[in-house]
């Protein structure tokens, strides 16, 4: 039976799968509650900077480890993306049951943003949610990849799905300007450092699902998409491809000094405050007054 087990830091999902769970509580009953969904190779710790900041301001966060990551079942194995969306629906329902009178928000980071976008844009969007934030969402689907790379990936996943891939040593990807945070992240045993080709195929597929679902995001739920101009993990090409498909009710914020890990960058508090303002009032101006993401003509 689905359940939140705070004593053992776990969330029991719809099929009995045990998922790791971290909760950042507030001193008093929260007016706003966040369900946090982390990105690729990460786990609930992705919220270790944002959640305490929000908790001090009355926002409680429940961040779970998606299956295949962190403390959850199937670590290192790629789960079916339908299961990932169902885990999100389950987490939302469980948190809503614990806080029926609070404003309920989903904050999805990178791959977690793609999972959230594909879930809310599906034929069965999660119920009971009042806000959604896509933080540096994973929007690097099949349509952004050169044809020769697509063919190579499709072939590899069928011929050798367990093949472990590593980026060349000369390829240096900086997901954040917060170097101390990155050093701790790289040494965290709950993070994943290498991926099988099936995992690469899987994450590209869920990002493509998010792109295709974007036009169907429900107008009944206020949404905010945030993106950093210095994000080289999810290139702006992928963002623009999806941004022009977003419905008019989706707001966006483009941070000139932001990297991929917006919620862990050196300027993270700027983003924390913007997200907090949006959670409190979806129509309110963002404190940073940054402009919309490129290619997005909505608000």
Residue ranges and their predicted role:
Residues 1-26:
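N-terminal cap/lid segment of alpha/beta-hydrolase-fold proteins
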Residues 39-52, 237:
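The serine-hydrolase catalytic nucleophile loop
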Residues 51-75:
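Conserved alpha/beta-hydrolase
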Residues 109-196:
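Alpha/beta-hydrolase-fold enzymes
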Residues 219, 225-227, 231:
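Short beta-strand/loop motif that positions the catalytic acidic residue
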Residues 232-238:
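Conserved alpha/beta-hydrolase "acid-adjacent" motif
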Residues 249-299:
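Catalytic active-site module of serine/aspartate enzymes centered on a nucleophile-bearing elbow/loop
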